[in-house]
Amino acid sequence: MKNLYRYSCGEGKLDFVMLHGWGMNSNAWRYIINRFGSHFRLHLFDLPGYGFSQSEESFTLPEISETVLKKAPPQAIWLGWSMGGCIASEIALRYPERVLALITVCSSPCFVSQHQWPRISWQVLSCFEQKLEDHLQNTLEQFLLLQTLGTLNSQRDTTSLKSFLFSRPLPKKEVLKAGLKILRYTDMRDSLNAISVPFLRIYGKLDALVPCKIAELLDEAWPHTESVIMHQSAHVPFISHTDDFLEVILYFYQKYFSH
């Protein structure tokens, strides 16, 4: 893909890649890039088919990972939010020499409910897929509402998300369907146990999409990783609780990279 959009900024010495979630674009990071920029050299991507990276094609998880990697710095901390966490994790597994550390935000190694595993039922994803056929914009707006559900400033944060989403071209239906397929079929619960770089998982206590009880299950399954639950947040802690989110990231950074 030739027109993959990347925006780089910041004065820090360490490269830091940020990947957005399903339906969104890299404008999602608008609230935090100024504060992160003094600590890191940020690289924000519109994933293939999203925002300014428009495409008629649909992409698989490996294809997205390889496309992004071609425009990424040689080594970086990789942060992925929601579906972006799947992509960052895929890159960490397949190209570990490119990843200094992995951070996933409100993400899951397995997004669809399995036996004794809390997640979205596949029927919910199927419902979104069906609605995309006739009501793409309304479906995306409904998804944004779910991301802030139950938080103190839900309406304000949903308004912010909408402004970020609609400030750039919307993804095509085929791209969104391919993204839902990634969410439905990806299962990295076993493979991510092999990650050897520092690995931080951030969750929102009020998240209606990624239940925070996943944190405890993965703490046990992946004892070499770390988790933080942000108790007043839902699916977008970097928007609803920007200062707290920055504090969590910087603590992790200083623990492993400040020597």
Curated annotation (Swiss-Prot):
Task: Check the record and name the InterPro entries matching this protein.
Answer: AB_hydrolase_1, AB_hydrolase_fold, AB_hydrolase_sf, BioH
Family annotation (Pfam families): Abhydrolase_1 (PF00561)
Grouped into one coarse class, the protein's main location is cytoplasm
Cross-referenced SUPFAM superfamilies: alpha/beta-Hydrolases
The alphabetized UniProt keywords are: Biotin biosynthesis, Cytoplasm, Hydrolase, Serine esterase
The similarity comment for this entry is: Belongs to the AB hydrolase superfamily. Carboxylesterase BioH family.
Record's protein name: Pimeloyl-[acyl-carrier protein] methyl ester esterase
* Species of provenance: Hamiltonella defensa subsp. Acyrthosiphon pisum (strain 5AT)
Organism lineage reads as:
Bacteria, Pseudomonadati, Pseudomonadota, Gammaproteobacteria, Enterobacterales
